[in-house]
Amino acid sequence: MKIALDAMGGDYAPIETVKGALEAIKESNISVVLVGKEEEIKKILQDYHYNESKIEIVHAEEVIEMHEHPAFAVKEKEDSSIVKAIKLLKEKKVDGVVSAGNTGAVMSSALLYLGRIRGIKRPAISTLIPTLTQIPSIILDIGANVDCKKEYLEQFALMGKVYMEEIFNVKNPKIALLNIGEEEGKGNQLVQETYTLLKNNPLFNFIGNVEGKDLFKGTANVIVCDGFVGNVAIKTAEGVAETLFDLLSSEIKSSLWSIILGLLLKPKFKNVKKKLDYSEFGGAPLLGVDGTVIISHGRSKAKAIKNALKVAEKMVKLEVNKKILEGLNKITDRGD
């Protein structure tokens, strides 16, 4: 199996992306196609011993930067690492794509060249969030669709359900709507209409609404919302987590006794940090496009890239997109 990696995507590319690819080929049976500036990639590879038969390079002269407008950049920079990686998937030269680059550009490129799974109205950007249980939850959408219809959210629920069943082996995952209250009548018109739709769908183990405070409790395995709400929720959570760790670090250094206490608690802090670390999950899928595309955090280092490549491998092996289509057909058969 071959996975294309956008070697130029992310804050620490190409050094960390290349290192992540090398770690991945050691731990799995995949081959990695590094897409990016060939000379830069070769220079990094010179410092490592690796199985050369499992690494290929496809040169891409251009890079879509994080600040660039996604749709314009994809059309203007056809020789960019993101676009060329997606084109390799379209041409069936690879089985999946991983990128830590401009999320919007990855999505725009995937829609332009791969299209949607038949019947999917809108793809969704998802992310995995740590919980108090041993299994993360998936939240979608987190930015692809600011304005949604109830049918879009129903499909997001389906895609999240299939992903949790196949990738994390969660049987009959609990599905919830992110809302301003737990009661059925809460929320705007979209949320209330979607509530009724999910409640009456026999395919779903729908548990109702969850509030923002419940996101990390593991109350639901799949959390559904529109892209505006999802993006605000995730960015807020990231900011709170970073601020808390900064405050703790500052307090620990404030006196000798707190330094000693901090040293004693260091292993516990490490465990907590590991549970909150996005690199453990690697990346999250762009669900609904007709191909396996994994989007990693822009700050991904080698470990996150390695794990993202493994997620892509698993998605391909388990035929997640095929199962999404099968689930979609069941919804359609109900006459919705």
Swiss-Prot record:
Subcellular location, record wording: Cytoplasm
Transmembrane segments: none
Key word Transferase present: yes
Reactions performed catalytically: a fatty acyl-[ACP] + phosphate = an acyl phosphate + holo-[ACP]
The enzyme's E.C. designation: 2.3.1.274
Biological or metabolic pathway of the protein: Lipid metabolism; phospholipid metabolism
GO terms, molecular function: phosphate:acyl-[acyl carrier protein] acyltransferase activity
Biological process annotations from GO: fatty acid biosynthetic process; phospholipid biosynthetic process
Matches recorded under SUPFAM superfamilies: Isocitrate/Isopropylmalate dehydrogenase-like
Keywords on record: Cytoplasm, Lipid biosynthesis, Lipid metabolism, Phospholipid biosynthesis, Phospholipid metabolism, Transferase
Cellular component, GO, one term: cytoplasm
Similarity comment: Belongs to the PlsX family.
Subunit structure: Homodimer. Probably interacts with PlsY.
Protein name per Swiss-Prot or TrEMBL: Phosphate acyltransferase
Lineage, top ranks: Bacteria, Pseudomonadati, Dictyoglomota, Dictyoglomia, Dictyoglomales
Recorded name of the encoding gene: plsX
